[in-house]
Amino acid sequence: GSAAVIPTERFIYVSIEDCAQGGKVPLDACSKAIDHALLDHDNLAIKFITLADCEKAEGYDRCERVAERHYRPRLMGYHFTVKGQATAVPLYAGKKGATVFRDAAGATYDWQRTEGVKFSPQAIRKVEGFVVAKRKH
């Protein structure tokens, strides 16, 4: 007999609560996947010496301080892949505007154009909010 094929679903969420409310991933799996993504964020996010350098590369109000001497892009959400077990990748605001996230490797996720990725309304509002904040300054 042939092996059962488990379909892969992909979602973008901004928090554990957002993930759990989406109804596709159990709360404990959301929490475990996001904990793993936070470790990836600590290890993979590019680090800058100054806030000015970070904001020049990432945009206004899109950086956070790390320890005493570094800045890195602020985490904006999580790209979940669900195929039997949920895994999550940390996402950052994209440089192209309100509709785009990117991961540490530079891959982009555009909620208006990305096929097969379902974005939560909270994820969309989160990115839009940062673009609005950027325009105010």
Language-model segments: which ranges?
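Mitochondrial intermembrane space
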Residues: 1-137
